[in-house]
A protein has these predicted regions:
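Ankyrin-repeat intra-repeat helix-capping/turn positions
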Residues: 35-36, 68, 101
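Specific position within ankyrin or ankyrin-like helical repeats
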Residues: 32-33, 65, 98
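Conserved ankyrin/ankyrin-like repeat signature
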Residues: 39-40, 71-72, 104-105, 133-135
């Protein structure tokens, strides 16, 4: 597991899971986050660690946010995923969403307490770099 991990590592007995009786390979779990698959929330509810991270330190929330899946990002945050957890490259989910220009994901992360100054580069610096503005907490 990366230095940031608190959950099980994919491939460990506690990090593997089953979906409808079918065993999922570790990469498949991360693919569900990249694809925005709602079933991932069911897996978390059934015991999959919400802070599960890949070898690069990308959590399920980071992957969902980076790939533009606002509803999944919100669902993971509501289940306790850390919206400020940095990956192995010291990148925060909010900065990734700003970089990818994902306004719905940005709004979700800000609403769940994402720190615009977390990570390198920070979301604030990324927004300035691309001439974008970050919403204020509570703004709609």
């Amino acid at each position: 597991m990366s230095e940031h991990g608190t959950g099980a590592r994919p491939g460990d007995d506690q990090g593997t899971t089953e979906q409808g009786g079918t065993r999922l390979e570790p990469d498949q779990v991360f693919d569900l986050a990249r694809q925005g698959a709602d079933v991932l929330l069911d897996l978390v509810d059934a015991g999959l660690p919400v802070e599960l991270a890949d070898q690069a330190g990308n959590t399920l929330l980071m992957l969902a946010a980076y790939h533009g899946h606002a509803a999944l990002t919100a669902g993971l945050a509501e289940r306790g995923a850390d919206v400020n957890r940095l990956n192995g490259n010291h990148q925060a989910p909010l900065a990734g969403a700003v970089f990818k220009n994902e306004p719905d994901v940005i709004r979700v992360l800000v609403e769940h307490g994402a720190d615009p100054d977390a990570g390198t580069p920070s979301a604030r610096a990324t927004a300035q770099m691309f001439g974008r503005e970050l919403p204020e907490p509570g703004a709609r």
